[in-house]
Amino acid sequence: MTPEWLKSAMDGNQKGYEDVVVAEVAYSDDAKDCESYQKGHIPGAIYVGDVEVEDATGSEEGAYNLLSADVIEKNLLSHGITKDTKVVLYGGDISGTARVAYAYIWAGVEDVKIVNGGIDAWEKAGYETETKANEGTEAKDFGTTVPAHPEYWTSIEDAKDKVANDDNFKLVSIRSEEEWLGKTSGYNYMDKAGEPDGAVWGKGAKTAADVADFTNDDG
């Protein structure tokens, strides 16, 4: 969604979104360690670290896998987020922001949006930022069993089985061409490169932050 729509919602002009929760997503464990959040964020925005939903230790064994359902639920409730909360996310790295959005939807949050263009687009639209740290009010009941959408996740074992035995199943890599070809792992802390056996390339962008291949020449 656009910065203009979000500002309208925050001003009370979007029915049903009067109490929207806005969150900046980044890779720091805590808001005080996040340079971008400290520099200036959307007014009222709380801080959410990717470590609240995924294993972000950088280990090759479990890197970026979802945390357990009970941990994710606990972290959501700590921000006052339930299945009925209207959530808007933004962040400097769209990949991390999208993974948090996915985790929220998997858990059961029914309305999750991402600000198109993030804080840069917000500021370009002429809107103010603030440096005051914000925190949500803890909620007690998420409102549904977590995950509400277990079908949005599959294990490595299930994926391998479907690649081998289900002609209607496609395991699609959306990584860069160099990652697809095994020329690089894409991470400076991981040596292993390549793709799962049987995967097809979805013609991902040049980097995780590049969307040029998905837009018209004029943007």
Residue ranges: model-predicted function:
Residues 1-219:
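Cytosolic catalytic domains that perform sulfur/thiol-centered chemistry
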